């Protein structure tokens, strides 16, 4: 009995241990089963009910869930577009930790979420985004009774690694993406309004990188941004620009180290500091043809705060800006690109569709609208090496002028200063300079002093206009103009001095494109005895309604009418001496002229005879070729010739002197000729007759004819010297291409050794005339013009 009593406690203890072991085993097995089964079960439930839960189809690779630690891992996660087989977002690996203990406090918290090899797309169609359905599904429905939320949600420490994110817009259209995206977000707690994001990524299609931080208070919409960009390609803007133009290409990249803070509710409530630069900006007909461009536009900002009326810059500069304006028969290059008066741009901005370019433009306008009424300061404002071109194709000949290099400089543009000084200087191609000095009151734009100087402009530059409107070109002349303006309270007091030194008309051009004015009579009235047009034209009155005082012009015209007949012998003497010198030193070639005329033959013969008599003497001949004009003339002639032969059913062998004269007099605006060009040149982006002719007649053919023309002129010139046996005393030097002083190609002749007596006599006579009235007054100007 004692033994039985002794074993009963032991059996009871054994049973307890056994029960505990069984329970522990069951629990352990259950835990193992839960760990083993919860992952596939969760995957099955999610994929089975994905559309019911989210409205989206979801697929996953492997799923690992630890319900005890809250760890979740999903591989090859893919969430598809709404009712589509296209992927919305995907991740090679998605990892998350849930704070399991906080579930006891009715708080669902994802303590960290990491998405590796992330891929996503934001798609916009009109005003609808591809994630709007998700927002609508998870947005609580409004009820009459407002009950406090019983379950709170936190999501913290979000990371995206090695991401690719696309932005697509069907209406524009646009398809842009960024790559190597690394995004870190502190996340959002249910009882916190702050959101902090750190980001970095590369431009997808092209070069460039961007990184920075973004912080925001989601309740009051205050924000803080830091952006560092390095050569970040701005291709994303190209589709929006494409919507604002008829044709053309665009490119640029961004350099920035910028900080900003403000509030999203008020565009003016923002403060910028740092540096912003746009590099290698190009806009043009194609990648090789610019309409507008610049190497670099840089803003260095101390403080820009429109709300506090502060615009403080260390420097604002633009390097190598370029702009080309072209005028056509009925429009210009800007009208062709952007519509009449920018209608293409305005139509796009008022269509109701989002356009990033117009949005940025409107934002900049909002930021800068109170600039001149605010406290502003720019320590240095500069334009370096600018280049501005103007081409006019509406005339019978192309007019072209270029202002380069343009340099504008101003130090300390400050509203607190009494005056702000701005200096402008540039060369004018083919010849000349322009200088402007402006001193302005920063508090009053109607209070300024202006001095300008326009010097050494060849009058022959304007021959296309003179031929078109008068039929008379000039073959010499220098234009200069100076002025001093003083403006106080919007009232002008200015002196302007115009000089045209030695202007001289050439023979009349006869073709159907030109109008006719009695230019010899007009020049006789305008030009004084010193062979100079010299007028002082004061301007007074209000800036918006100035008065031009033409007393000097009228007085000189009346004097010339009375005096000119009496002084005709003097003027003829001057003209004859100038002609003797000019003909001794130059040989002018008309457009497409191959053989010297009779007078030129006589001149060449005299030179050859002079060299024959003076074996120690020699001449050097330097061709000055008006290459652009010669090429344009040949292109137009050959195109008109091709049209003429087709119109009259003739071949090349039937084209003689009569046909040549008819083609030369034919207008390049001739209706039938224009129809012929348009029939053969199908492109709607070729706007000028010159460009159409260049496509009709291959450039290689034109260059061959130019080379042949140059060689024929040289051979014809040397023919007389060869006959006289003095060809070794004649040397040709390298040709100069450009716009010659007389508006024509010519040979410049330099004598070495002995000078011809007639030339010496002409020089002496001209020096004598230049040292006496009325030419003495302009002696210095003539010397400067020659230089």
Predicted regions and their residues:
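Buried hydrophobic packing residues in well-ordered domains
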Residues: 50, 74, 94, 113, ...
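Extended terminal
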Residues: 7-23, 304-309, 314, 369-376, ...
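Interface amphipathic segments
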Residues: 103-108, 174-251, 290-292, 306-363, ...
């Amino acid at each position: 009995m004692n033994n039985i009593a002794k074993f009963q406690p032991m059996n009871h203890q054994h049973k307890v241990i056994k029960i505990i072991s069984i329970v522990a085993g069951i629990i352990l097995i259950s835990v193992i089963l839960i760990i083993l089964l919860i992952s596939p079960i969760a995957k099955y439930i999610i994929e089975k009910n994905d559309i019911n839960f989210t409205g989206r189809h979801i697929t996953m690779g492997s799923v690992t869930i630890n319900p005890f630690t809250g760890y979740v891992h999903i591989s090859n996660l893919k969430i598809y577009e709404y009712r589509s087989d296209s992927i919305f977002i995907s991740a090679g690996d998605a990892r998350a930790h849930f704070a399991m203990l906080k579930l006891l406090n009715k708080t669902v918290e994802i303590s960290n979420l990491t998405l590796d090899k992330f891929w996503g797309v934001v798609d916009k169609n009109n005003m609808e985004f591809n994630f709007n359905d998700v927002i609508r599904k998870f947005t609580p429905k409004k009820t009459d009774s407002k009950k406090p939320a019983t379950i709170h949600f936190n999501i913290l420490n979000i990371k995206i690694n090695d991401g690719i994110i696309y932005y697509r817009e069907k209406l524009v259209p646009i398809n842009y993406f960024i790559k190597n995206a690394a995004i870190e977000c502190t996340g959002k707690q249910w009882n916190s309004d702050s959101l902090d994001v750190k980001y970095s990524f590369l431009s997808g299609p092209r070069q460039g990188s961007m990184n920075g931080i973004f912080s925001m208070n989601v309740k009051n919409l205050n924000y803080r941004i830091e952006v560092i960009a390095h050569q970040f390609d701005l291709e994303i803007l190209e589709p929006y620009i494409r919507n604002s133009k008829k044709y053309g290409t665009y490119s640029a990249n961004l350099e920035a180290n910028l900080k900003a803070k403000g509030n999203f509710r008020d565009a003016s409530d923002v403060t910028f500091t740092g540096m912003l630069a746009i590099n290698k900006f190009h806009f043009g007909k194609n990648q090789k043809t610019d309409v507008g461009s610049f190497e670099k536009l840089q803003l260095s900002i101390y403080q820009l705060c429109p709300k506090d009326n502060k615009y403080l810059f260390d420097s604002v500069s633009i390097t190598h800006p370029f702009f080309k304006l072209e005028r056509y028969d009925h429009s210009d290059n800007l009208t062709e690109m952007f519509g009449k008066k920018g209608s293409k741009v305005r139509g796009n901005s008022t269509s109701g569709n989002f356009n990033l370019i117009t949005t940025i433009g409107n934002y900049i306008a909002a930021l800068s609208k109170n600039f001149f009424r605010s406290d502003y300061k720019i320590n240095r404002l500069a334009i370096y090496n600018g280049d501005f071109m103007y081409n006019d194709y509406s005339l019978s000949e192309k007019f072209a002028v270029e202002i380069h290099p343009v340099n504008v400089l101003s130090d300390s543009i400050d509203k607190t200063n009494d005056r702000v000084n701005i200096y402008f200087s540039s060369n004018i191609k083919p010849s000349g300079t322009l200088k402007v000095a402006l001193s302005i009151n920063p508090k009053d734009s109607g209070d300024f002093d202006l001095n300008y100087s326009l010097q050494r402009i060849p009058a022959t530059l304007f021959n296309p206009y003179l031929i078109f409107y008068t039929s008379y070109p000039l073959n010499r002349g220098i234009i200069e103009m100076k002025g001093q303006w003083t403006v106080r309270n919007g009232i002008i007091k200015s002196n302007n001095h115009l000089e045209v030194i030695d202007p001289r008309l050439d023979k009349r051009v006869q073709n159907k494109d030109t109008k006719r004015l009695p230019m010899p009579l007009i020049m006789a009235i305008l030009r004084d005895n010193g062979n100079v047009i010299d007028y002082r034209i004061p301007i007074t009155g209000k800036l918006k309604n100035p008065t031009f005082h033409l007393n000097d012009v009228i007085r000189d015209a009346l004097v010339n009418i009375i005096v000119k007949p009496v002084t005709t012998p003097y003027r003829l003497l001057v003209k004859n001496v100038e002609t003797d010198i000019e003909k001794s030193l130059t040989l002018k070639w008309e457009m497409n002229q191959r053989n010297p005329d009779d007078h030129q033959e006589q001149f060449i013969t005299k030179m050859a005879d002079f060299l024959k008599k003076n074996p120690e003497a020699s001449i050097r001949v330097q061709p000055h070729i008006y290459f652009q004009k010669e090429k344009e003339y040949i292109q137009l002639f050959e195109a008109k010739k091709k049209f003429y032969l087709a119109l009259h059913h003739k071949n090349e062998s039937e084209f003689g002197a009569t046909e040549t004269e008819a083609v030369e007099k034919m207008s390049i605006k001739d209706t039938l000729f224009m129809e012929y060009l348009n029939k053969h040149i199908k492109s709607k982006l070729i706007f000028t007759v010159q460009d159409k002719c260049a496509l009709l007649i291959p450039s290689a053919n034109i260059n061959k004819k130019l080379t042949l023309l140059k060689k024929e002129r040289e051979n014809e010139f040397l023919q007389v010297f060869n006959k006289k046996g003095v060809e070794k005393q004649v040397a040709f030097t390298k040709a100069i291409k450009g716009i010659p002083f007389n508006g024509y190609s010519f040979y410049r002749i330099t004598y070495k050794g002995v000078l011809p007596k007639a030339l010496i006599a002409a020089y002496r006579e001209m020096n004598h005339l230049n040292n006496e009235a009325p030419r003495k007054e302009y002696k210095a100007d003539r010397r400067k013009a020659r230089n």
